[in-house]
Amino acid sequence: LNYVPRYRTVLKSEELSTVDENNWKHCFVINKLDHMIYTVMWKGQLVRINPKNRTAEILLKKISNVATGDGGKAGSDSYIAFSPIKGEENVLYVSLADFHQIWRVDVSKITPEDKDTYNGESYAGKAIYEGVMNGKGWEDGLLKNAKFRHPRQICFTDDGKMYIADSGNSCIRVIDTTM
């Protein structure tokens, strides 16, 4: 028996030929409904991968509308999770660690026309409204008032509570997504 790991690559179209140049991903998740793999690249592209034929497609060119001040060259580590709430299983939550914010996207409602213009919905983090530098820190409160400092991994309980590993503040934060 040969236990050598198999190297599998994603088959990229012409549009995706350079998507991974100076770009990477930190996490991926499988959607329970469509059985596709989703990831958000460092530069913000939402990518869907079909695991059966290994083809990929860019669903959105950029999650968030963060102005980085460098012509869009800066990116963010992204950590993602689908909602467990019945009826919202296609809602993907995206934690943008370097921007101190959380965004969400309903992947079932994305159309080809959205690719260039839609950035998802801002969800939590004062940095969305006050900017990356002013909005980071430590503050609990409502979604728009919460301050994060490098929010990373996201996970959910069955009743819709989102737990966020806020690594810069060395704590676990909780958001009730049903409110």
Model segments located where?
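Gly/Pro-rich loop segments of beta-rich domains
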Residues: 1-26, 53-80, 112-152, 168, ...
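Carboxylate-rich, polar loop motifs that coordinate divalent cations or form catalytic acidic clusters
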Residues: 2, 29-33, 40, 47-49, ...
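Residue-level detector of Asp-centered blade-edge/turn motifs that repeat once per structural unit
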Residues: 30-34, 82-89, 156-159
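Conserved beta-strand positions in repeat-built beta-propeller and related beta-rich domains
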Residues: 30-31, 37-43, 92-98, 164-168
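Hydrophobic packing within well-folded, soluble alpha/beta domains
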Residues: 151-154, 162-164, 172
